[in-house]
Amino acid sequence: MTAENTPLQGNLFVESEENLLDANSLQNTNSVKDSNLNDEELSKNAELRPRKRKKSVLLQNSVGEQTEDFSNDERPAWSHHSLVEINELTPVLRHYVELKQKHPERILLYRLGDFFECFFEDAIGLSELLELTLTGKEGGKKIGRVPMAGIPHHAAERYCSTLIQKGLSVAICDQLESIQNKEGKLLKRGITRILTPGTVLEEGMLQAKKNNWLAAILIESNSQTNQLKWGLASADISTGEFTVKEGNGIDTLEQDLLNIEASEIICEQLDVDISKKWQSNRIKITQQSKTSFSLQEAKAILKKHYNLKTINGLGLNETELALRAAGGLLYYLKETNPIHNIGVKNKCSKVVLDFPKNNLRGDSLIIDAQTRRNLELTKTQKDGHFQGSLLCAIDRTLTAMGGRCLRRWIENPLINSELILQRQRLITLLVEKRPLRKALRNLLRTMGDIERLSGRASAGQAGARELVAIADCLEKLPKLAANLQNLSINPPKWFSKLENINPELTKLAEEIKDKLIDNPPLSITEGNLINDSVDKILDGLRNQLDDQNEWLSNQEKKERNISGNNNLKLQHHRTFGYFLAVSKSKANTVPDHWIRRQTLANEERFVTPALKERESKIFQLKVKAANREYDLFCALRELVGGYAPIIRETAKAIAGLDVLLGLAELASTNNYCAPNIIDKKSLSNSRSINIKGCRHPVVEQMLVEEKFQANDIELGDGVDLIILTGPNASGKSCYLRQIGLIQILSQIGSWIPADKASISIADRVFTRVGAVDDLAAGQSTFMVEMAETAFILNQATQDSIVLLDEIGRGTSTFDGLSIAWSVSEFLAENIKSRTIFATHYHELNELAKKMGNVANFQVLVHETGEDIHFLHQVIPGGSNRSYGIEAARLAGVPKSVINRARGVLKRLEEKNKG
């Protein structure tokens, strides 16, 4: 069977009415016209013979597939579609090239029968990326064979997921009509889906506990300040979140882009001058020549998307660049959703987004990308793994929604003390009320990701199982609300969504459960989705199918009697239809009216004229029933999609509750305490950080054989700068990081790993920990270090936390000491930020004698002969030794090298004394 003659299969990515089998066009030969198939007769039939619901059964079909082996083919010569003369190609390849010319930057998957095929450069690239066999296909008499590689249609999502993870975009070209009555004509095909890293909705292509951001940026030069001004819009179309912001300076934009970790970043074609100013090697940007970022078109598309007469209520008129970036993002979403352009009757295919929220600077604790990396908030600094990060250590959420919410909290800690305390009070209540915490967590344990599921429904991509999952979750809401009644505290505003459940959601759950069977199949185009007694026309069709099945059963008995073969079976094959199966030994004794259909190794298959005639009618009934079920399902999906905004509001509240429950679980099982949050508006010592017995939240969980050494800190109340000295590998960096992490945990409302704490709110956290060459940017280790230091000195305020681990190491000793000294003085005298500076420049201990707001601390070491033992204990006072040679010995440096180092050190010390 050739690819063009293979029966049409439902597309994985879009289920359209055109992809359904049409009872009026299929099986032209031997078709049976029956007046009983009109809707009025079917409805009457259903009233006379009402159907009773049966227990749901998940139907599974396994269809064998055959693939042609081209492993011996030579590699075709044509390596790019632009090398061929399009008019010399076969019709299929000509259409492929026409589509490829419209989507040159995307991998084009072209549906041919049971496979999605690629040709030319896409085939070569796909074969290398996915380790597929590179084959060939005849391109025409003058062309010869062209490169071809393909993937089975049923595995398309898995392969596309791999491509998306590699940052590639995919255009899906599917068959839009059935082949039964085409009589050799070329099938109608068109782009039904465009998959890009920032626009995917498929569960298998998304990280469950991480937002998938699509960002759009607009950059313009400010002629007055000679500085670049920018607008940024970012949206997660899977959850509906949509934020915009404006700013100045390319460095600030780059920090924001690095912070959100967008899967895809688009922008208008950059001017040459802007491109020269911004040559970042850390951010990949796709310039979109077709994307519209003009003010007029941005306003138009915003009004159309949200069905508004004016956009004044969105509050974006004062931020023109952000407004235009938002318009560009929506325009890109429209371009990558081609459903309406090809005539597919998918009634519900709109991506539902929240109204754009203006994300103003100053609403949250600012954490730059370098600090996020140094503190290992969401991934480790060394290898980028989730394991070993702060998020991994504290995540006790039970839902994907809660996991994403916790990540957002960590990335954007609060600076409003009342909001912080609202969260903290709820966590305290949940710590104290263990039975309530346990009951709520048990309810959330089986809660699906209704935030994303409702988005898939609104986009017309949810299947029946996903609608049932939504209903299952919505059914739990009343019980969740009952457990939250009569709380003795004042919860955040979003909490009301859980205390007072919208009754419409309960009704929606009931309607889904009433219409869909309990365990529906994956496919939504082959029937067996809708319950009995939902639709009279469907019931009438099912009644007639029952009659046909009864006829088949009687026919089997009849043919057994005629043939005298009690082992005869009447069976059905998806390709060959109904047939009578007999063993080889009895194949020669069958009745004369039997017609041989197929010969197998152990069996012969036959049909009869009556069976062939009846088969056509049964097929017609099945197709009409399947189409009816699909229409009913689409109507239900559209209904659910309409509730997406309400469902998502509830989902966000569930996510917040999940985070609070998880943090309460963390606090109760890890001996955390609730810090006293100091509001700088009400107390004079608003900059104080006083923590007793603080611990590193990640490291202490990794220790198995030893207990973590807790330490104290007092900062901001008379002391603005701590000079921390001590040996290498003694725990100075760990101490610095744990202070930063505890500050962040405090400002998300969490309890912290400490015995007791009083913490004031910070506006920013800065770190300068370690440095590496940035060869791509032409910067040495020392230049990277100085750039990071300059950034801190230019941005820090007296409300900031600054954590420095060495400055001036990449130059001569005296140069480095001079820089470290002057930086310390500037921080203590000019900025007065709360700073901890870990250093091996013991000369900096002299600063405490000259400046009243500087204090010296050291990490203790116990010496026994030549051995040293790190106690990891921080105490007042400065150290005058670094124990670098001892640390080198512990690291395994050869003994001869160690001995030589001691000799050199002794001579240098004597020379210094002299």
From Swiss-Prot:
Residues 28-74 are annotated as: Disordered. ATP binds at G726, P727, N728, A729, S730, G731, K732, S733. GO terms for biological process: mismatch repair. GO terms for cellular component: cytosol. Disulfide bonds: none annotated. The keyword Transmembrane does not apply. Keywords: ATP-binding, DNA damage, DNA repair, DNA-binding, Nucleotide-binding. It comes from the Bacteria. Transmembrane segments: none annotated. One of its GO terms (molecular function) is damaged DNA binding. Pfam families: MutS_I, MutS_II, MutS_III, MutS_IV, MutS_V. InterPro entries: DNA_mismatch_repair_MutS (IPR005748), DNA_mismatch_repair_MutS-lik_N (IPR007695), DNA_mismatch_repair_MutS/MSH (IPR017261), DNA_mismatch_repair_MutS_C (IPR000432), DNA_mismatch_repair_MutS_clamp (IPR007861), DNA_mismatch_repair_MutS_core (IPR007696), DNA_mismatch_repair_MutS_N (IPR016151), DNA_mismatch_repair_MutS_sf (IPR036187). This protein is involved in the repair of mismatches in DNA. It is possible that it carries out the mismatch recognition step. This protein has a weak ATPase activity. Belongs to the DNA mismatch repair MutS family. This is DNA mismatch repair protein MutS. It comes from Prochlorococcus marinus (strain SARG / CCMP1375 / SS120).
